[in-house]
Each structure stands twice: as structure tokens, then as C-alpha cells.
Amino acid sequence: MTQADFKPLLKHGKVFVLDVRNKSEFEEGHIPWAKHIPLKDLAKRIHELPTNKPIITVCRKGGGRSAEAAEMIPGADWLEGGTNAYFGE
């Protein structure tokens, strides 16, 4: 999902954001309302995800860990550019 498509959905609470980075990366800064589940823990914690909203997975640059996570979750998408693009880095 592009940043342009994502930001209005986030603003209106229409998506569930899943941050799959490691703990230290998440603590450095994260997208508001994001749930943190590191990619290495996702398979055993997938039951924690909602079924009533589209899920957008996020990592630092987008397309690596977030794409891998999105493949594990039916119907999920990943955020292009990740948190770097979201925060303008």
C-alpha cells in the first residue's frame, strides 16, 4: 500500500497497523496506534490480530519484513517505504 493511500485510512481508523520490527526499532519511534509483534513472533501470536479491519504490516523500509508478514496474514498488505517514508526519513 502506498503512503498516500495509507495515511487517510490511518487518520480515520480504517486500518490495523502491525509493526513487525524488533523491539528497539519500535521503541525508537512508531506509527500511531501500531501494534508491535516482531516478525519472529508473528506465527505464534497471529491470533492477536483483528478480523474486522484490513491489516497493514510495517517495517523500517517496506517490502522486506513487512512483505513477509503480509504473506502470513490472509488479506493483509504492507506499507511501501515503511516507517522511514512515513516519518520522512
Model regions and ranges:
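Rhodanese-like catalytic fold shared by cysteine-dependent sulfurtransferases
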Residues: M1-F16, K23-I56, R60-E89
